[in-house]
UniProtKB/Swiss-Prot annotation:
The gene is upp. Belongs to the UPRTase family. The keyword Coiled coil does not apply. CDD domains: PRTases_typeI. Its EC number is 2.4.2.9. This is Uracil phosphoribosyltransferase. It catalyses: UMP + diphosphate = 5-phospho-alpha-D-ribose 1-diphosphate + uracil. Keywords: Allosteric enzyme, Glycosyltransferase, GTP-binding, Magnesium, Nucleotide-binding, Transferase. It comes from Neisseria gonorrhoeae (strain ATCC 700825 / FA 1090). Its cofactor is Mg(2+). It is an enzyme of class 2 (transferase). Pathway: Pyrimidine metabolism; UMP biosynthesis via salvage pathway; UMP from uracil: step 1/1. Catalyzes the conversion of uracil and 5-phospho-alpha-D-ribose 1-diphosphate (PRPP) to UMP and diphosphate.
Amino acid sequence: MNVNVINHPLVRHKLTLMREADCSTYKFRTLTTELARLMAYEASRDFEIEKYLIDGWCGQIEGDRIKGKTLTVVPILRAGLGMLDGVLDLIPTAKISVVGLQRDEETLKPISYFEKFVDSMDERPALIIDPMLATGGSMVATIDLLKEKGCRNIKALVLVAAPEGVKAVNDAHPDVTIYTAALDSRLNENGYIIPGLGDAGDKIFGTR
């Protein structure tokens, strides 16, 4: 499976704090931002760089910069917004695209109710952010939308993933790498990840 579990001590520590049943909205939201920042560092390891000249204090020197069009970060509404600040802390020049999905009552498949993409999507790397990868339906649908816009360099950043969701993404889009803080046990009968985090969107926005 094309999944990268980020096994860093700080990531594991912060994720455990988020799993606590009495984790407050403020604490959960703060930890979401902190985890997103740490994980974005790992997900950006293979960014291509190029050399260029700058004027240093002692004259011209050669330095490095990220090559090509600026990354677009793609939060899936609404829970994905909770990870956005953490990624932007690390990559403040990133462009933001947004995808909103809802379940079709007849087919039970996710359909888009809102999408806003930046220009030149076919030239940009994209990083999809969503706290939970459960069934994988929303992630697959978002990747479908990005590829329709010509985007080919796509990664997914999630806090917790279920094996079912990882398999769904890998089956539909084997070229997309998933970065996660934990690959949990399974989904329960209601589609929640076990042990998971509960409803991450409700916890981030204080609507639980």
